[in-house]
A protein has these predicted regions:
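The feature encodes the CheY-like receiver
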Residues: 66, 84, 96, 114-115
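Charged docking surfaces used in two-component/phosphorelay signaling
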Residues: 24-32
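Non-catalytic signal-transmission and effector/linker regions of two-component phosphorelay proteins
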Residues: 1-14, 119-133
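Acidic, metal-coordinating helix/loop segments flanking the phosphotransfer/catalytic sites
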Residues: 39-58
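Conserved acidic carboxylate
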Residues: 17
């Protein structure tokens, strides 16, 4: 595969979100922009995926998840050597300074409050994907 062919492969974004409506909205938005999407609905499934799957281009990660929360999942991402550079954007309805600081301290690259504005979220995704290119 040459550089031109590699550039045409759509970036894969991992969504870890337990709210079905939000995950469907995220998938729709991202697929319309040409991204490939993998969705997992709970922290246990995400931990297994992080341990065994190839790295995505970016992770959109809910904070409050069943079984394992988003803060712990960020730590798992940062512990896996081949995933360390993957940008992690945390999504949450919790709008407190404490949660923002906790997410950033855990290793998240960005923190987005729900309900989010679609264009803003897409701009953040593009910024993080471009920064990692």
């Amino acid at each position: 595969m040459n550089i031109e062919q590699a550039a045409r492969i759509p970036a894969t974004i991992l969504i870890v979100e337990d709210d079905e409506h939000i995950s469907q909205v995220l998938r729709f938005m991202l697929e319309r922009q040409g991204y490939q999407v993998t969705h997992l609905a709970d922290g246990r499934a995400a931990a297994g995926h992080i341990a065994s799957a190839s790295r995505p281009a970016l992770v959109l990660l809910d904070v409050m998840l069943p079984y394992i929360d988003g803060f712990e999942l960020v730590r798992l991402v940062r512990e896996r050597e081949d995933w360390r550079g993957v940008p992690v954007l945390m999504l949450t309805a919790k709008n407190t300074e404490r949660d923002t600081v906790r997410a950033l301290d855990a290793g998240a690259n960005d923190f987005v409050i729900k309900p989010f504005q679609p264009n803003e979220l897409l701009a953040r995704v593009r910024r993080h994907l471009t920064a990692g290119a």
